[in-house]
Regions:
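Pre-active-site segment of Zn-dependent metallo-hydrolases
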Residues: 15-26, 84-85, 89-102
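Short, conserved loop/helix-junction motifs that constitute active-site signature segments
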Residues: 28, 47-50, 77, 100-103, ...
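Conserved beta-sheet core of the metallophosphoesterase superfamily
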Residues: 54-55, 90-157
Length: 165
């Protein structure tokens, strides 16, 4: 089995101790990490040393990050195709647009909307991990996804970060 941690919309320009702690807690035991964009700065990915890292840029990424990361990417893990794209435009019909952009993929991972989602449409598993940073003053905790890839199945789940006390 392959366990993949999924996050998006971190919107930070430097790694904080709290970010490190959240990542260590959320992605313990993960073999790989997918960041679905709006990491803002490429240095954020250095948090995940020792893991395979797959990322795309988002609309809030700085210029250097946009030059280093693609807008879309397809990876293959354990025989499954996983399309990664931050997403653009309005929330309405975003998954239809992603299906046209990444046709035939077994799983599509995206961000942009800050709304955690994990469901199947036809033969495609959609995962949007929501915003890893949460919504601050609005009180919603950060969220992330986990993808379990076995020989004969893909299963995703959404989780909330433990709130700071």
């Amino acid at each position: 089995m392959i366990k993949v941690g999924i996050l998006s919309d971190t919107h930070i320009t430097k790694i904080t101790e709290q970010f490190r702690k959240n990542c260590a807690s959320a992605f313990d035991g993960c073999d790989a990490i997918i960041h679905a964009g709006d990491l803002t700065d490429i240095s954020i990915l250095s948090t995940f040393t020792g893991k395979d890292i797959y990322g795309v840029c988002g609309n809030m990424c700085n210029q250097a990050t946009r030059q280093l990361l693609p807008e879309t990417k397809i990876i293959y893990l354990n025989g499954y195709s996983i399309g990664i794209c931050h997403g653009t435009g309005p929330r309405h019909n975003i998954e239809e647009r992603l299906l046209r952009l990444l046709p035939g993929t077994d799983c599509i991972v995206y961000g942009h909307t800050h709304t955690p989602i994990c469901h199947n449409t036809g033969n495609t598993l959609f995962i949007n991990p929501g915003s890893f940073q949460g919504t601050g003053n609005y009180g919603a905790p950060g969220t992330y996804g986990v993808l379990h890839i076995e020989k004969d199945s893909l299963k995703g789940s959404i989780h909330e970060l433990v709130r700071k006390t």
